[in-house]
C-alpha cells in the first residue's frame, strides 16, 4: 500500500478503508494478492449488479476485441450501439409502455444528471431545480448544486446556484413534506421561483438509504404534472434491478419525464450512462451536449448481454425480491440481537441498511468486517448507516455468509 500512499493523490478513499491490493473477482467474491477471500456487499457502489466477470459478458467482450472491432466511436454508428438501442427498447421500454429517446451523455452518473438538468432548463426556459435533503447526484458543478451533502458541496470551490432543497419523505418526523413543497410553489412570497424540474432518488443511496414511500412519489409526480414541472428520476444507483424492478419507480406507477441511468447499465462494470428523455422534450441541437467517451462499444456489448440474460421476463426480478426478504430478516435479527446499537432498518430491494446512531460505530463495524472477509461500506451524512449493496446475483449462502461475518464484527466492536 506504500506506493498508493507515496504516488497517488490524497483524494483516494476506498483504498484507505480497504487497505489491500485486490487481484481477482468472480460473482460476489473478491480475492487479494495474499489469497484472502472477501464477500462483496458493495458491488462497485452499485456498478456490478450482475456480479464480477459474468461468464457470457466476458466471452462476448473477448471475442469482440480479438476480431478487431471498433472500440472507440464517439456517437458514430456501430453495430453494438444499434443492437443495444434495439434491445433496450424492446426488452425494457416497450414491455413497460414507456416511450423515451435514449441519449448517451458520457460514461458516468454525473454526466447523465448534468444532461438532464440542461435539457430541463432548455425546454422550460426556467433555471431553478428543486432537489431534496440528503440527495446525492454527482461530483460536477451542476450535479453538486442539487446534492445535499455539505462536505461534497464545499469541494466545488464556488457558490452553487439555481437549486432549492426541500425535505425528502420522512425527513422531519410527523411533518408532511408534500404539503410543505406545495405551499412553497403556491405562495408568491416563498422566494422559490417556479422550477424547471424536480430531481430525486427513490432510494437515497449515499444519503442514508432513505426510501421514499410509493404515495410520496405519486404525489411528487402529481405536483409536477399540475405545475408543468419536469420530473427527473436519478436511477443511477437504484436502477437496473437494484430495488427489485428494473426501474426503481415502477411500483409507483409513474412515468418520469427524464430518467438518469449509469453504474450497472454497463453490465460488467464498464463506464456507461444513458439519459432517457420523453420525445417531446428531446429538443437538443446536434452536438449541443457531447463527450469523447459516450460511445463505449465494449459497454454496449456487455449491457446488451445483461438485458438479454436477465430481463427477458420477470424471473430475475422475482429472485431479487426473494433475496431482499432474506436481507431484511438478517437485519431484523441484528437489531434484536444487539439492542444497544439502537439499530433501524432502511431501504428496499437489495439496497438496504442499518442505521446506528452511535458516532463512528458504523464505520468501526465496516472496518472490523473487512478484517474478517466482508466488503461493506457506510452511508449517510454522518456515515451512520451500514449499507448493504451486494451483487443481485448473490445466492442465499452468500447473503448468510456475509451477515454472519457482520454479526461477528458487531460483537467485536461492542466488546471494545
From Swiss-Prot:
<dbReference type="InterPro" id="IPR004637">
    <property type="entry name" value="Dat"/>
</dbReference>
<dbReference type="InterPro" id="IPR005814">
    <property type="entry name" value="Aminotrans_3"/>
</dbReference>
<dbReference type="InterPro" id="IPR049704">
    <property type="entry name" value="Aminotrans_3_PPA_site"/>
</dbReference>
<dbReference type="InterPro" id="IPR015422">
    <property type="entry name" value="PyrdxlP-dep_Trfase_small"/>
</dbReference>
<dbReference type="InterPro" id="IPR015424">
    <property type="entry name" value="PyrdxlP-dep_Trfase"/>
</dbReference>
<comment type="pathway">
    <text>Amine and polyamine biosynthesis; ectoine biosynthesis; L-ectoine from L-aspartate 4-semialdehyde: step 1/3.</text>
</comment>
<dbReference type="GO" id="GO:0045303">
    <property type="term" value="F:diaminobutyrate-2-oxoglutarate transaminase activity"/>
</dbReference>
<protein>
    <recommendedName>
        <fullName>Diaminobutyrate--2-oxoglutarate transaminase</fullName>
        <ecNumber>2.6.1.76</ecNumber>
    </recommendedName>
</protein>
<keyword id="KW-0663">Pyridoxal phosphate</keyword>
<comment type="similarity">
    <text>Belongs to the class-III pyridoxal-phosphate-dependent aminotransferase family.</text>
</comment>
<dbReference type="GO" id="GO:0030170">
    <property type="term" value="F:pyridoxal phosphate binding"/>
</dbReference>
<keyword id="KW-0808">Transferase</keyword>
<dbReference type="GO" id="GO:0019491">
    <property type="term" value="P:ectoine biosynthetic process"/>
</dbReference>
<dbReference type="Pfam" id="PF00202">
    <property type="entry name" value="Aminotran_3"/>
</dbReference>
<dbReference type="GO" id="GO:0047307">
    <property type="term" value="F:diaminobutyrate-pyruvate transaminase activity"/>
</dbReference>
<dbReference type="InterPro" id="IPR015421">
    <property type="entry name" value="PyrdxlP-dep_Trfase_major"/>
</dbReference>
<dbReference type="InterPro" id="IPR012773">
    <property type="entry name" value="Ectoine_EctB"/>
</dbReference>
<feature type="modified residue" description="N6-(pyridoxal phosphate)lysine">
    <location>
        <position position="263"/>
    </location>
</feature>
<keyword id="KW-0032">Aminotransferase</keyword>
